A protein has these predicted regions:
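Non-catalytic cap/lid and distal C-terminal segments of serine-dependent acyl enzymes
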Residues: 8-27, 41-47, 53, 60, ...
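Aromatic-rich carbohydrate-binding modules that target alpha-glucans
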Residues: 3, 11-55, 65-88
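Short, structured interface segments
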Residues: 88-101
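Extreme N-terminus of proteins, especially the signal/transit-peptide cleavage junction
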Residues: 1-3, 135
């Protein structure tokens, strides 16, 4: 007999509602939602455990109690049954992209050829529910690591996504921000000539980061404004990322002023630029020689105190001092937040992204 533990990450707007596992095992109700396993909410997961004989194979689905509210993927499709064969104790972790009875917006793919990068980059684009009605333009939320921001099935690290579409939809329905077009920039698989992953090559200032920032500011934005109804005003554009993505977004703020009006920088990897910034004080020297930050923009920074993030406190403290010295208003034009228990993970960024949006759009 083995213990099978289910650990489910549910959509952020209904994550405290009951979640059930139903499937082809007696402990899961034999496909009867009325007899399914009800999970318990222990933030940020819904959890539950069953016992199963070794060698048993079972299939299962995730619902909110009936087939009308079963889980769907990021595209609104009902996925195939999940399967598990029992040999040892196991923890099955899954992320629900959305529910059938509330799926909203539309997710699509696009590609852009870049002269600057001498290649193509794939885009994942989420259009808000009202996009198909009328001819109005929408603010743009542009995010790095596009494979990780919408769809848990494509998230590179832990099958947990940022729930970017869910956060924007939830906050827009609550009046905390306007509806927006959300675009994720995907990075190619494989390695560069420098033996770095293509993602690290795209974003690192020691490698291709400057060229990638130029691509974003001078090629990608005009493409999006031409092919989608995005608002081209600076104050309507947000650029965001985590880790190296946050660092590249900050580089865009410095090197391409006047383009974006909002920046969401989660777990900014200042220590990853050791060749450029060999110590924390070098960050200030680098800031002093860069073009002045646009005084009219709004910037959100955060870092946790777990894993890689516990290295970032000193850099962020210096950055905050620099901005205040330059006359920036803490809490209004910028904020730097330390997140107790926060780490350098997609799950942690998923929890924190909503706060970034709330601050930047308030």
């Amino acid at each position: 007999m083995s213990l099978i533990r289910f650990r489910i990450v549910s959509p952020i707007d209904r994550r405290e509602e009951p979640v059930f596992i139903t499937g082809s095992h007696e402990a899961l109700g034999n496909w009867d939602p009325a007899r399914a396993l009800r999970l318990e909410w222990h933030a940020p997961f819904h959890t539950g455990t069953i016992e199963a004989d070794t060698g048993v194979h079972f299939e299962y689905k995730i619902t909110r109690g009936n087939w009308e509210s079963e889980a769907v993927d990021a595209w609104g499709h009902v996925p195939h049954n999940a399967q598990h064969e029992v040999w040892l104790d196991a923890t099955l972790t899954r992320t629900v992209a959305d529910w059938k009875d509330r799926y909203s917006g539309r997710l699509t793919h696009d590609r852009i050829h870049s002269r600057i990068l001498a290649g193509e980059r794939e885009l994942t684009v989420w259009l808000p529910p009202s996009y198909g009605r009328g001819e109005g333009r929408f603010p743009l939320v542009l995010l790095y690591d596009g494979a990780n921001v919408f769809d848990p099935a494509t998230s590179a690290i832990s099958n947990v996504d940022w729930a970017a579409d869910e956060w924007v939809d939830l906050l827009a329905r609550g009046g905390a921000m306007p509806e927006a077009v959300v675009v994720g920039i995907c990075h190619p698989e494989g390695f560069s000539e420098d033996n770095a992953t293509m993602r690290d090559f795209d974003l690192s200032p020691e490698l291709g980061g400057a060229a990638f920032a130029q691509f974003v500011a001078t090629e990608l934005l005009p493409y999006l404004d031409q092919h989608y109804r995005t608002d081209a005003r600076q104050e309507a554009r947000l650029l965001g990322g985590a880790g190296l993505g946050a660092l590249n977004a900050f580089h865009v703020a410095l090197a391409h002023p006047g383009v974006f009006g909002k920046f969401a920088c989660l777990s900014t990897s200042f220590e990853d630029v050791s060749q450029v910034l060999p110590d924390q004080s070098a960050l200030l020297r680098a800031l002093e020689v860069e073009p002045a930050l646009d005084k009219g923009v709004r910037m959100y920074f955060d870092h946790g105190d777990q894993g890689l993030d516990e290295c970032y406190g000193g850099y962020h403290a210096l950055l905050g001092g620099f901005l205040r010295e330059k006359g920036w208003q803490d809490g209004r034009e910028f904020t730097i937040r330390q997140i107790p228990g926060g780490g350098h993970t997609e799950l942690s960024w998923r929890e924190r992204f909503g706060e970034a949006l709330r601050f930047l759009f308030r």
